Amino acid sequence: MNYQIKRNTEETQLNISLANNGTQSHINTGVGFLDHMLTLFTFHSGLTLSIEATGDTYVDDHHITEDIGIVIGQLLLELIKTQQSFTRYGCSYVPMDEALARTVVDISGRPYFSFNSKLSAQKVGTFDTELVEEFFRALIINARLTVHIDLLRGGNTHHEIEAIFKSFARALKISLAQNEDGRIPSSKGVIE
């Protein structure tokens, strides 16, 4: 199934679709480093994203990065509500040379985000690295996930962020996988 949101504000104009079919993604955010990270995310999560985005990047990349996180989170929530049969929990460790990241995901319906990741530099190229946390916070809160992201080892900032995006993607893939009995994975019988 394909989920789509068009979101237009005074700061950004977004047209984003999400599918859980593993087909080729098309990502054009206007922010090269973010395009790269989202491409890695789609490859390692098995999700398909189509993103056409423009915005006030002449100010900085904050609005477009955060707004894309918001919309991807909203789309993930729709996918989760439709799917209903999923493993729920996922954990992934990903090394990227000297960097090592761990992400733990719970599709709980209770939004919580812990980001224990001290990045080595404030910028990768022109991209402000503090936006990594902003992107994930926006996505996770809007998808109603519980997520813990920990950067366990660091070094090169590009490697640190790449390990974070890949570990999140792989943990999400595990948590979205169909569960064996087809039931909602909660003793309450519901995840909202």
Swiss-Prot record:
Pfam families with a match to the protein in the record:
IGPD
- Reactions this protein catalyses: D-erythro-1-(imidazol-4-yl)glycerol 3-phosphate = 3-(imidazol-4-yl)-2-oxopropyl phosphate + H2O
Q: Which GO terms describe its cellular component?
A: cytoplasm
Q: Which domain of life is it from?
A: Bacteria
EC number(s) of the enzyme?
4.2.1.19
Pathway participation: Amino-acid biosynthesis; L-histidine biosynthesis; L-histidine from 5-phospho-alpha-D-ribose 1-diphosphate: step 6/9
Q: Does the keyword Protein biosynthesis apply?
A: no
Q: Which GO terms describe its biological process?
A: L-histidine biosynthetic process
The protein's UniProt keywords, in alphabetical order, are: Amino-acid biosynthesis, Cytoplasm, Histidine biosynthesis, Lyase
**UniProt GO molecular function:** imidazoleglycerol-phosphate dehydratase activity
Q: Where in the cell is it found?
A: Cytoplasm
InterPro entries in the cross-refs: IGPD_sf, ImidazoleglycerolP_deHydtase, ImidazoleglycerP_deHydtase_CS, Ribosomal_Su5_D2-typ_SF
Q: What class of enzyme is it?
A: lyase
- Classification via PANTHER family: IMIDAZOLEGLYCEROL-PHOSPHATE DEHYDRATASE, IMIDAZOLEGLYCEROL-PHOSPHATE DEHYDRATASE HIS7
Into which family does the record put it?
Belongs to the imidazoleglycerol-phosphate dehydratase family.
> What protein name does the entry list?
Imidazoleglycerol-phosphate dehydratase
Name the species this protein comes from. Answer: Staphylococcus epidermidis (strain ATCC 35984 / DSM 28319 / BCRC 17069 / CCUG 31568 / BM 3577 / RP62A)
